[in-house]
């Protein structure tokens, strides 16, 4: 009894307020029977002696949400203070009121929105939610589906988001269930768009009427067409005076073969044409092909980590995972034992539901009454690396009997940019590792492995899909996980053929083979599509010629290969194709493109192939000692320019010491660039105005001994203390 009342006192002092609904947690005895129920809204216990059934019926009408703490007696709560932290309770998703209503598969439409950055994709999603009254007007805000603070600050969509909306068609009067997936538009997050496309039967292609079709939009739309999705073209921003609907429509017809009657007009900002788009979704996009008689199968297309709900509901489990998935066949319910087929992991369903767009649980414990739905599921899985996007979920009994086959829907994304991420404080290595594991659960294109550096200690070598992906990842580490990190300069994977005929891929300069062992080397190239206004074409050609080489200088510099140029009919846009080294895209190529075209130019790149080039390892020496973390791999014919840039940057970056510090760029044993950090000298014999010269000699010898100690401290602190280095010019 003492334990019981002690626990009641603790939780009632920290009761949470909620004007919307009640939250309850059920405490179980060691024998598994319900001990009592605690109402986190009112801070009171409701046990069987307190007429729990009547109170539940009266207060929450059987619609409230429950969280379970299994197999723990009150003695456990008393002895472990972490169970007393009820300040971290979060609102558990409410049960869905319409859960018992049957949903016919023929009335389901799964679709995504494809658009370039700033073409009005998120605004259009807002209008869908507003028009269908899926979100109350007082709660609706701009970029409603963009949950990250970073997304709102930068005005871009980083993570795909799903929402289920109900729409009453004016054509047949039927109520349709529309599963909307809002997708990112930037090329660095193209993997998110690919996952969205794989979970849909149709897509809305949104094009800004003031800018026309962008290169990245063409790439993503072609992926959707290859997957067999029905495309609905929409020209947005028709309310603006400089919107050129005619030329944009002509471009859509040229690139994708649309009929003019298929192209819709809209203004997401003003709410024009929203109903026409929704009707087109209902009429044009086919329902999912399903069979309820077949065994349950679902495709995992996203997941994320929920630390607070894990602390409440799954005390014996390290964390809680929520998986977003699409049901292809059959159905499931809470309590079922499911298996992740590719990972071969079995767990019990502890929660499931849909997005409206907030998470809602299903009251009848039935996830869907028809296949083809998009929803979420929770299961007690102990390790973050056990969740894989593209995995197939099925019931354990079906998997054991080999009644189901995995759904092969995703291709693994290969990183194109590599950088090292290290904790600013050496003791934060475990914290950083945990943060990266949780981040990977929500960003499946992000890859990392452990790496040790003599300069910055233990850390991780990470792979990204581009520089923006790298920048966003570092921002998320700092904001979401409170982890301060050092980021080394981005690099690309090079390939070396050794004299023993073995081939190695090197994405870190510290792993570069000895020069005597290398027979030949190659660097990655990529196929780049550029779209620029015709009036900027000559200026753009000058950029290509000056920064990445022309066809005539290709043999000597191995930079830039022009392939073809096409004029888009009835527009002032020029589309060009180039082969460019991937390392050039990592530099300031994009900034130069935007600068010379006044922001109208765009580019996209896909695929990688290797071209032979003579590469070398450029080492940096500080006071005669190699700074391994500053070494880079570079084309030999550009080594001098890059070495000079690094040396000049370090001379300006490292503060002066009491002695001169030479900074050198070295290839093998040959110094190709050198400079000195001037000394800040202290005149130790200034106080000796005269007298015995041995006194001055002694002071100078003492100073020399101190300098020897300080000299050994040149490497590391000053170069490492600069923090995030991803924007360094070298």
Curated annotation (Swiss-Prot):
Subcellular location field: Mitochondrion inner membrane
GO BP, one annotated term: positive regulation of translation
GO molecular function, one term: ribosome binding
Pfam families linked to this entry: EFG_C (PF00679), EFG_III (PF14492), GTP_EFTU (PF00009), LepA_C (PF06421)
One cellular component (GO) term of this entry: mitochondrial matrix
UniProt domain tr-type G: residue ranges: 106-289
E.C. numbers: 3.6.5.-
Protein keywords: GTP-binding, Hydrolase, Membrane, Mitochondrion, Mitochondrion inner membrane, Nucleotide-binding, Protein biosynthesis
Superkingdom, natural source: Eukaryota
Coiled-coil positions: none
Membrane topology note: Peripheral membrane protein
Chain residues that bind GTP: 115-122, 182-186, 236-239
Reactions performed catalytically: GTP + H2O = GDP + phosphate + H(+)
PROSITE patterns: G_TR_1, G_TR_2
UniProt entry tagged with the keyword Lyase: no
Family: Belongs to the TRAFAC class translation factor GTPase superfamily. Classic translation factor GTPase family. LepA subfamily.
NCBIfam families: lepA, small_GTP
Role of this protein: Promotes mitochondrial protein synthesis. May act as a fidelity factor of the translation reaction, by catalyzing a one-codon backward translocation of tRNAs on improperly translocated ribosomes. Binds to mitochondrial ribosomes in a GTP-dependent manner.
PANTHER family in the cross-refs: TRANSLATION FACTOR GUF1 HOMOLOG, CHLOROPLASTIC, TRANSLATION FACTOR GUF1-RELATED
Comment field (misc): This protein may be expected to contain an N-terminal transit peptide but none has been predicted.
Protein name: Translation factor GUF1 homolog, mitochondrial
Lineage, opening ranks: Eukaryota, Sar, Alveolata, Apicomplexa, Aconoidasida
């Amino acid at each position: 009894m003492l334990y019981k009342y002690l626990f009641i006192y603790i939780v009632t002092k920290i009761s949470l307020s909620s004007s919307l609904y009640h939250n309850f947690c059920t405490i179980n005895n060691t024998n598994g029977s319900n001990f009592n129920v605690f109402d986190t809204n009112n801070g009171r216990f409701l046990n069987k002696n307190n007429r729990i059934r009547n109170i539940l019926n009266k207060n929450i009408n059987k619609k409230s949400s429950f969280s379970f703490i299994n197999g723990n007696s009150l003695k456990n709560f008393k002895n472990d203070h972490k169970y007393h932290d009820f300040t971290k309770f979060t609102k558990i998703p409410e049960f869905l009121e319409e859960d018992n209503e049957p949903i016919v598969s023929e009335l389901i439409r799964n679709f995504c929105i494809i658009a370039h950055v700033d073409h009005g994709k998120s605004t259009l999603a807002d209008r869908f939610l507003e028009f269908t009254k899926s979100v109350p007007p007082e709660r609706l805000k701009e970029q409603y589906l963009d949950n990250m603070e970073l997304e709102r600050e930068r005005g871009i969509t980083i993570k795909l988001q799903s929402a289920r909306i109900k729409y009453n068609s004016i054509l047949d009067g039927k109520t349709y269930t529309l599963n909307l997936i809002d997708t990112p538009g930037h090329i660095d997050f193209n993997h998110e768009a690919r996952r969205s496309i794989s979970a849909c039967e149709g897509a809305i292609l949104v094009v800004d009427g003031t800018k026309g079709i962008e290169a990245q939009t063409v790439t993503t739309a072609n992926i959707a067409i290859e997957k067999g999705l029905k495309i609905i073209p929409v020209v947005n921003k028709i309310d603006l005076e400089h919107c050129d609907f005619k030329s944009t429509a002509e471009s859509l017809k040229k690139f994708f073969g649309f009929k003019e009657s298929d192209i819709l007009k809209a203004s997401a900002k003003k709410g024009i044409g929203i109903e026409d788009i929704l009707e087109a979704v209902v009429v044009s996009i086919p329902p999912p092909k399903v069979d309820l008689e077949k065994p349950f199968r679902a495709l995992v297309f996203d997941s994320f980590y929920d630390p607070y709900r894990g602390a409440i509901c799954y005390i014996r489990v390290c964390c809680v995972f929520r998986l977003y998935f699409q049901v292809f066949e059959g159905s499931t319910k809470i309590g079922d034992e499911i298996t992740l087929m590719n990972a071969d992991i079995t767990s019990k369903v502890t929660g499931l539901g849909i997005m409206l767009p907030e998470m809602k649980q299903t009251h009848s414990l039935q996830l869907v009454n028809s296949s083809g739905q998009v929803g979420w599921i929770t299961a007690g899985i102990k390790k973050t690396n056990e969740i894989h996007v593209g995995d197939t979920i099925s019931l354990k009994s079906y998997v054991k009997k080999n009644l189901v086959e995995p759904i092969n829907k995703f291709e693994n994304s290969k990183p194109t940019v590599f950088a090292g991420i290290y904790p600013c404080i050496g003791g934060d290595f475990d914290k950083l590792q945990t943060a990266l594991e949780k981040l990977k659960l929500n960003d499946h294109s992000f890859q990392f492995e452990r790496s040790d550096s003599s300069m910055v200690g233990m850390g991780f070598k990470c792979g990204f899909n581009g520089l923006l992906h790298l920048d966003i990842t570092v921002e998320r580490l700092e904001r979401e996980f409170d982890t301060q990190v050092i980021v080394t300069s981005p690099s690309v994977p090079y390939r070396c053929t050794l004299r023993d005929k073995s081939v190695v891929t090197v994405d870190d300069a510290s792993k570069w083979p000895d020069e005597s062992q290398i027979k030949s080397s190659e660097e990655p190239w990529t196929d780049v599509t550029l779209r620029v206004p015709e009036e900027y074409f000559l200026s753009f050609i000058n950029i290509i010629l000056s920064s990445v080489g022309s066809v005539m200088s290709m043999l000597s510099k191995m930079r830039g290969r022009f392939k073809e140029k096409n004029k888009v009919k009835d527009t002032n846009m020029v589309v060009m194709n180039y082969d460019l080294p991937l390392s050039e895209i990592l530099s300031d190529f994009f900034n130069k493109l935007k600068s010379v075209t006044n922001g109208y130019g765009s580019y996209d790149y896909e695929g990688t192939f290797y071209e032979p080039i003579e590469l070398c390892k450029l080492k940096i020496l500080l006071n005669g000692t190699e700074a391994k973390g500053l070494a880079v791999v570079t084309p030999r014919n550009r080594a001098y320019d890059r070495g000079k840039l690094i040396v000049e940057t370090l001379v300006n970056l490292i503060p002066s010491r009491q002695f001169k510090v030479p900074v050198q760029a070295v290839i093998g044993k040959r110094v190709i660039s050198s400079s000195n950090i001037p000394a800040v000298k202290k005149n130790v014999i200034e106080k000796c105005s005269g007298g015995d010269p041995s006194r001055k000699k002694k002071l100078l010898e003492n100073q020399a001994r101190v300098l020897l100690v300080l000299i050994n401290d040149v490497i590391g602190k000053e170069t490492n203390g600069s923090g995030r280095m991803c924007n360094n010019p070298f």
